[in-house]
Amino acid sequence: MPKKTDTPDYKPSIYSLTRDELIAWAIEHGEKKFRASQIWDWLYKKRVQSFDEMTNISKDFIALLNENFVVNPLKQRIVQESADGTVKYLFELPDGMLIETVLMRQHYGLSVCVTTQVGCNIGCTFCASGLIKKQRDLNNGEITAQIMLVQKYFDERGQGERVSHIVVMGIGEPFDNYTNVLKFLRTVNDDNGLAIGARHITVSTSGLAHKIREFANEGVQVNLAVSLHAPNNELRSSIMRINRSFPLEKLFAAIEYYIETTNRRVTFEYIMLNGVNDTPENAQELADLTKKIRKLSYVNLIPYNPVSEHDQYSRSPKERVEAFYDVLKKNGVNCVVRQEHGTDIDAACGQLRSNTMKRDRQKAKVGQ
């Protein structure tokens, strides 16, 4: 059985080290600063998957690296590729737990959606991610490794495609794993490594107001998205348990602080649930709620991917989405209906992992 622990006993991934930490580790072990820069270059520019491929590093130091670290800690279990080019990956962690990562082809490039936790405790009643409660946080290396394996998948195709955008919107609440997510952001944004621009990275939160305030002060120029999904406290609390701890008044005070501090736009994610949150009245409430920050906010209307375990919910019909959208536009709200990806595979966040675990349990029963 996988171990439920945040302090695993396996060797850490070298991806867990920021560039400054790698330099400090190399110096501590008798090497010069430039040696760490060479290793960093091998990892993020040449993208090797083994220390033994680092041909300008001494055998003794490679042995030391192998003794203390692995390169990529993930094992690829399943890859599903959609007709629209979306690719969904199921990765196995060193302790046997499973996570999902999704590659989406956009008109502006390749965008990867990463997972930050094994399971989720936020408890949104419509979401596949929360079907399994949080087991543990991913460390920085395990989050970074998702990007590296997706990039490897495309490197092996030899077409020169490069991951250009990252969305931290996979399984888990990123701000509930704050330190590791922040290290991940700084690693992938490092100019000497993957050099993915901060404005090409989006972090999504379900609304941990105190962490939004903290994030505003980090000086990290990435984009912030907030999973809103309802325009009033009663409705939001009924579908998102987090609202009972951070009601809309607290959440929007934090969002206003973030905007004032960073002068950056916030995107609101709003999943369209038929007969639940998709009426014209709901749209007017949403327009009123966001009025004060209209110039620096944006609403993303999201078609719902049905989840069998949450069969009380269904996708809003096209005409209801259009009516909702029209109300927002008439009120001057910047909004868009999100383009769908991967509708012919296990598209909903957490679905591939959940379905695979079901199959694994069924196989185990048959084998008993």
UniProtKB/Swiss-Prot annotation:
Positions contributing to S-adenosyl-L-methionine binding: 172-173, 204, 227-229, 305
Cofactor: [4Fe-4S] cluster
Keyword entries, A-Z: 4Fe-4S, Cytoplasm, Disulfide bond, Iron, Iron-sulfur, Metal-binding, Methyltransferase, rRNA processing, S-adenosyl-L-methionine, Transferase, tRNA processing
Segments forming domain Radical SAM core: 106-344
Note on how the cofactor is bound: Binds 1 [4Fe-4S] cluster. The cluster is coordinated with 3 cysteines and an exchangeable S-adenosyl-L-methionine.
Active site: 100 (proton acceptor), 349 (s-methylcysteine intermediate)
Gene Ontology cellular component annotations, sorted alphabetically: cytoplasm
Highest taxon listed in the record's lineage: Bacteria
Pfam families: Radical_SAM, RlmN_N
Residue pairs linked by disulfide bridges in the UniProt entry: 113-349
Catalytic activity: adenosine(2503) in 23S rRNA + 2 reduced [2Fe-2S]-[ferredoxin] + 2 S-adenosyl-L-methionine = 2-methyladenosine(2503) in 23S rRNA + 5'-deoxyadenosine + L-methionine + 2 oxidized [2Fe-2S]-[ferredoxin] + S-adenosyl-L-homocysteine; adenosine(37) in tRNA + 2 reduced [2Fe-2S]-[ferredoxin] + 2 S-adenosyl-L-methionine = 2-methyladenosine(37) in tRNA + 5'-deoxyadenosine + L-methionine + 2 oxidized [2Fe-2S]-[ferredoxin] + S-adenosyl-L-homocysteine
Note: Reaction proceeds by a ping-pong mechanism involving intermediate methylation of a conserved cysteine residue.
Name this protein carries in UniProt: Probable dual-specificity RNA methyltransferase RlmN
Natural source organism: Streptococcus agalactiae serotype Ia (strain ATCC 27591 / A909 / CDC SS700)
The gene coding this protein: rlmN
